[in-house]
């Protein structure tokens, strides 16, 4: 019998580390396998193993709309109010041949229900409807909470987890056969949902994310990042739902198939929505065309299919015929070590040699400025160290905040959260405290590295359960109870023991980085050779990747970068994959870029040429002391840092890098000899415009956009506080609202924040807003621009009604619309003046409307 993970003490106090709770239960953290699952029958088992197909049902919202559901009705309440309507729709899907019927619980979390019903009652009623319809398998449906997680919003990871766990327990009690987590755009949110499923049930977990036209989720996650992360944290089947039509999703699914061995599923929309002559929302892909596109995905290796918005029982019936005539083919994928943030993958293939630089600067050892920042809780300084290392060429950031006098569990959570909001790089969580390690990796959006485990049995007993449960990578140090051995063979023996112990937890060598531990040449000169030999042995015999803290080799010697760079080159020759080093060291990075050419990692030498075009040999200009000194500077600014591109504006750099900690003081300093509007128009607004360009180019994603907007807000607030009332011009008044019947307001909230930070006065009417309330605000406040948001296809009717009312009563008002179900064409059909694909586009439209 499965025992749910206890995450709170009897008095309700949350436990700092869930692994402690697992141990209280007598549970063991390990990599979950199919044998750990409660699977209803062999057909479902075959689908989870990837040897059989499975057919989910299609759209529910559009079917409810066709059945006459009123605009603004909460679909989950229909399980009580009109259960026969739900059952009739689901019976049509059963008769069409669907294996899985999705319970009508998509929005059945406590946040969305908001007291309208209990989570347990909704799940019980919804599952009863699906059983009444004759479902072979009933899936408990878990959708987004409807609130942004930190650092973009106010909802914590733990609060999200608790909301999902309540749904999971309700689903188990109601008798679901599996869980489907769907329509997620935030990697942290879907991770919380998967963990809630795993830790509160032993049922199979299917998990899908929704992608925009640019191939990324709303928050910038790619299909590869999604698949790697969902695989790592224990989803049994993973994939894509909603988003676009099946033809558009085929390429995204194919990208997932290259990075995971788990079964991949797709539930596409029936194309794009539009309004027919009768005012109904309809979709443009009919059943035969839908099946033709899905057939291509099945040929690629997708084994679980179904439908989303606009699909009907007719669409599913043709898919039934399709999969009945096909057997999944075995998939063969080359293993690799993958480390991810929410937006970036660093991939180290097992059959090749690729270099990933791990930045070492976020470590308080020997760094008084960082030590003081940690004592003061100055995480802005920590973030600045991460940003500078990203700009200097690091691929991964090591994060160590260990000081004896601070609360490491608390600080490492905050540091990783803020770093993920400001940089794109994956993180390596570096701590000797298992509670701190778990606090960080549990809440981390992506697949990180844990630094580290070693050959001591106690350490392996503490760390490997975390690596297994959270699906992370891990660094293994070649030391044990006897210390660091002198010989290569003894170091290898410890590494071999670490790899063998990891295997007991289901952790393969493709998730292990062995660090043979660099000793300083000043006192252990003969050790350099042993270190390199040990690394070669590990690579040849264990199939692992190798890391080294290369800076240690030169400690206590002059010209440290010179000696260190030569050792780094030798280590690359011995098979080093991940040097842990200072990317601000020019000599070290010169060695990295040069080796990437020689190892053919940098094909065509494009990266090398881009970096060194116009390079001057420092040895040839040694006769000129000033030039020689400049050429040999070891930590010249990297491209993108303040001063490197000729732009020394500190406001620009703080806004672009999303650093809000020091911007208030800098703004106050500049106000001493700058006009307030000059500061806004010539410093803040150009910086925000630059961020918008980076966002459009795909170099920034929503977390970075919002971090920059928050930094600008701090600066604007400082100006408003210090300047006399009326001195700062009002750029214009804007009203934003989520339309009647729709309770999803994440996108609207992001637009509001960005427009606020551009200097507009924004009136936020909230969610589920009646058209008359929007009209009243527009008239009373003399609003010139209105932003309307809708996520659900069933609420676009309310959006159209609001637009017609505004244009009739206030002809001069302009209206922007946005939301997952909208397209430029659809927006035009319902009468909107503008369509905004994202928050940055909303800011550009506002500038056009107000002539700024």
Indicate residue ranges for each PLM-predicted region.
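Domain-level signal for soluble alpha/beta catalytic cores
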Residues: 1-513, 519-852
